[in-house]
């Protein structure tokens, strides 16, 4: 099987959420959604890898469409395949995106490349027929991934109409769903108000949570 990328699609959409933290108003934030369309077929369906950029970083449609997607599509298909020629090579695709770029992180550029990179890895795992965590463990570890990871619930954002009771209900709902650690946002109100918000939360959470 010889795999190639047929298309890299990007759309920029508003997050359209009324929440905010100390720095960002998410009602004005956008995000990029990327689809890497391949000619591979798995279980009767064309393989498409999907990626999106994290909230807190704006959509990168301009960079993706004008610089990075064209470089992938202009590259010789064989130059983007792995050594077995039966899957894509994310590292070669990353190198293709970085052609004619000055080395370094450089802010927004890393978001654009990272969003495509996420979609590429999603496609690679689908072509391989494995969950991505298993694929990464097979390639870069002992093939025995830890199936339990530390997670926490981030909440307590600021939004219109929020009161202490709603804040308490929100944070308690995370504990009720099994989270052992929760985090709330601070810095978006006065120090006195933030302290009152923290006190309200501590009334409904156990010590150390």
Q: Model features per residue range: what roles?
A:
Residues 141-209:
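Metal-dependent enolase-superfamily TIM-barrel catalytic cores that perform enediolate-based chemistry
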Residues 37-40, 45-50, 85-90, 144-150, ...:
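Glycine-rich, flexible loop segments associated with nucleotide phosphate handling
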Residues 1-61, 67:
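Structured beta-strand/loop patches that form or line metal/cofactor-binding pockets in enzymes
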Residues 30-42, 48, 69-80, 128-133, ...:
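Short regulatory "switch" loops immediately downstream of catalytic or recognition motifs
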